[in-house]
Amino acid sequence: MKGTGKVVGLAHDVRAGTHMKLRATPSPAPEFQHGFATVDKYIPVGQAWLGAFEEKLWERLGLLTPGSSKVLPIFEDQYIASGGQIAELLSGRDRMVIDVRLEAYAEMGLDSASLCSHPYDLCTELILREAGGGVETPRGKPLRSPMDVTTPVSWVAYANPVLARRVRPVLRSLLP
C-alpha cells in the first residue's frame, strides 16, 4: 500500500486450504537492549575488522564500556540472506542490520566485492520502507545502485526512525 506505512500480506496454509492476514510491523522500540541488532560478518575474512567496528559502535552509542564486566543485552542474528534480514525487521524481531563488508574489505586492501551484498539482494527494501522502517547507505543516503548482479552494495536497515537518528551520526564517524 504505497504511502500508507502499512504492509499486509497473506499466509496460505496449503494443507488446510485456509489463509490469514499477516501485518508487517517493524519494532517501535527506541532502544537496542534486549533486541536483535546485527553487523554482518558471515565469513572469516574481515571478522576481526567488523568485530572491532561493532564494539566501537556500541561504545560510542554508550551501550558498551571498555573493560566493564557488564554484559551488553543486545543479540545478533547472522541471517545469511539480506532479504531474510529485512523480513526479520518487518516481523518486529530485529531492530537494525548493518552490512559494511565492502568498507571492511577495502580497508583491509582486499578485492572481495563478490562477497558483499548486491542490488538484487535488497529487492525487498521498499516493503520495509512502506512499513515504517528504513534502508539506506551507511552514510545515511538513499540506496542508488544499478540494478545488476555484480555491483557491491553496503547498506543499513533500521526498524524505525528513532533508531536511525541515533545511530546514523555515530556510524558515519566510524567509517573510513
State each model region's role:
Residues K2-P176:
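An extended, acidic
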